[in-house]
């Protein structure tokens, strides 16, 4: 393509937003709403439409950054949903609509979307069509699975994760997740088939 998509916090905009620009760095345009916090912007194949996650339906303000009273933690904002839009930001459409964190979405070469969600009470990986249809849960184990990416041919998904057995560490993980937080600890890299097998 002829444009890049990226997230950044610019002067006058309090939270990260999604922008596009020409390959030479000119013609920078905000393509997200300017409200809430956004993450993980991608072009669909062909470059005519984009995908990103945003908290803007939960409020125009930035969601609060986590404090570190509980150690080093990351926010897992339950107001994140996944959206598609035309490449210029028009035609914004919400494609996830369940309670809880839906973010970290990426796109395969065929336009299928893979993402992280806590819709079932744990950080798991799901896939869906670019319009939100044909939702499939791909992982099912205790502990955080996320950050999925398709292989170049779309046949595999690589992701970070960790299975946490019952016990104090899992209890801490669930307690934090119920507060919209996650403590990234030891994680491993996994590869599975695009349908969640192997």
PLM features per residue range, with description:
Residues 7-18, 32-38, 53-82, 96-102, ...:
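A flexible loop/linker signature enriched in serine peptidases of the S9 family
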Residues 22-26, 86-90, 129-133, 193-197:
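Short loop/turn segments that connect beta-strands within beta-propeller blades
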Residues 146, 156-157:
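Conserved active-site beta-strand-loop modules that form the wall/rim of enzyme catalytic pockets
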Residues 4, 50, 113-114, 157:
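Hydrophobic beta-strand positions that form the internal "hydrophobic ladder"
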Residues 45-46, 108-110, 152-153:
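Residue-level detector of Asp-centered blade-edge/turn motifs that repeat once per structural unit
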Residues 19-28, 33, 49:
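A short glycine/small-residue-enriched secondary-structure motif
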């Amino acid at each position: 393509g002829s444009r890049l998509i990226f997230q950044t916090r610019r002067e006058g905009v309090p939270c990260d937003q999604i922008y596009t620009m020409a390959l030479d760095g000119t013609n920078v345009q905000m393509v997200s709403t300017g409200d809430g916090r956004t993450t993980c912007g991608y072009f669909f194949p062909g470059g005519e439409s984009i995908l990103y996650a945003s908290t803007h339906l939960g409020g125009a303000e930035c969601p609060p950054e986590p404090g570190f009273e509980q150690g080093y933690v990351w926010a897992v904002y339950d107001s994140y949903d996944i959206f598609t839009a035309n490449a210029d930001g028009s035609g914004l459409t919400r494609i996830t609509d369940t309670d809880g964190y839906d973010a970290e979405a990426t796109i395969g070469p065929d336009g299928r979307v893979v993402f992280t969600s806590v819709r079932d009470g744990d950080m798991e990986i799901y896939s869906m069509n670019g319009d939100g249809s044909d939702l499939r849960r791909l992982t099912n184990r205790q502990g955080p699975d996320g950050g999925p990416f398709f292989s170049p041919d779309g046949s595999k998904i690589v992701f970070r994760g960790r299975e946490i057995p019952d016990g104090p560490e899992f209890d801490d993980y669930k307690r934090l997740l119920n507060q919209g937080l996650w403590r990234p600890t030891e994680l491993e890299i996994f590869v599975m088939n695009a349908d969640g097998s192997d």
